[in-house]
Amino acid sequence: MIRIAIPNKGRLHEPTMSLFKDAGLPISGGAESRILFAKTTDPDIHILFARAADIPEYVQDGAADVGVTGMDLITERGADVEALLDLKYGKASLVLAVPEESVFQSARDLEGKKVATEFPEITRQYFKNLGITVEVITVSGACEMTPHVGIADAIVDISSSGTTLLINHLKAIDTVFSSTVHLIANKKSLKEKGKILDIKTALESVLNAKKKRYLMMNVPEASLQAVKEVLPGMSGPTVMKVESSRSSEESFLAVHSVVDADLIFTIVNKLKNVGARDILVVPIERIMP
């Protein structure tokens, strides 16, 4: 059996549930039912719902074989785990921030000052790398208020959009750490349970598919070479003969290709200009290596 720890609530919960569903491993239950354990469609893969901050230690200690959580939390806990895959969502930055009216303009201005944070280890390492001595004050919440009540001169805190800083009259003066959600594994489990890599491959196939689109079109046989020059494809386009019920009609080929999603606008217009018609653009659910 493989046990996967995923966030039980918060901004990482729903994207994680959706990713597993798209990968063919839908999870029963979730935050709404307040359950601790759940099953997937694979009888050998079970789910453990946990606080995102606790998942690195759960995986390190073997309570879970695999986990999904933010790289900021993994780094802060110093967890001895194997990072398998950047899942590309849950983007956030740990920023160094000071009051809007503060005279501090950079980290170096904080020499000998107090910095409050929920991420003391990352914060200490950041200032150590800069050769700056500060007093790090660990708080468990409401970090934004500490400069306004005299507890600290600055804070290091998570900022996804900057709105919370703005509301609390704070300004960011540096980025301390950039984070996304990662798939991690217990090192011993990774060696002993081959299915962990199957899980990684399934999730990765969904991430790869989101960046691609499937193109289908009809192409006059005389225009095939021009169309091939437009289509990059993953391993060249697929070309098939289109059967016509009328022998007098122009001969057509069906051309299929996988292309980068962000190139669709440009490619479709080029294809039309070289004679392609009946062009279909289709989302892809998964791309398996």
From Swiss-Prot:
**One biological process term in Gene Ontology:** L-histidine biosynthetic process
In the UniProt record, the signal sequence range is: none
Question: The organism sits in which domain of life?
Answer: Archaea
- Identify the InterPro entries for this entry: ATP-PRT_HisG_long, ATP_PRibTrfase_cat, ATP_PRibTrfase_CS, ATP_PRibTrfase_HisG, HisG_C, N-reg_PII-like_a/b, N-reg_PII/ATP_PRibTrfase_C
Q: Which Pfam families match?
A: HisG, HisG_C
Q: Which GO terms describe its cellular component?
A: cytoplasm
Q: Which PROSITE patterns match?
A: ATP_P_PHORIBOSYLTR
Kindly indicate whether the keyword Amino-acid biosynthesis belongs to this entry.
yes
Q: Which CDD domains match?
A: PBP2_HisGL4
The molecular function terms of the Gene Ontology recorded here are: ATP binding; ATP phosphoribosyltransferase activity; magnesium ion binding
What pathway does this protein act in?
A: Amino-acid biosynthesis; L-histidine biosynthesis; L-histidine from 5-phospho-alpha-D-ribose 1-diphosphate: step 1/9
Which reaction equations make up its catalytic activity? 1-(5-phospho-beta-D-ribosyl)-ATP + diphosphate = 5-phospho-alpha-D-ribose 1-diphosphate + ATP
| The protein's required cofactors | Mg(2+)
Q: Does the keyword Metal-binding apply?
A: yes
- Chief site of localization: cytoplasm
HAMAP family xrefs: HisG_Long
What family does the database annotate?
A: Belongs to the ATP phosphoribosyltransferase family. Long subfamily.
Query: What is the protein's known function?
Result: Catalyzes the condensation of ATP and 5-phosphoribose 1-diphosphate to form N'-(5'-phosphoribosyl)-ATP (PR-ATP). Has a crucial role in the pathway because the rate of histidine biosynthesis seems to be controlled primarily by regulation of HisG enzymatic activity.
Task: Give the NCBIfam families listed for this entry.
Answer: hisG (TIGR00070), HisG_C-term (TIGR03455)
Give the protein name, as stated in the record.
Answer: ATP phosphoribosyltransferase
What organism does the record attribute this protein to? Methanosarcina acetivorans (strain ATCC 35395 / DSM 2834 / JCM 12185 / C2A)
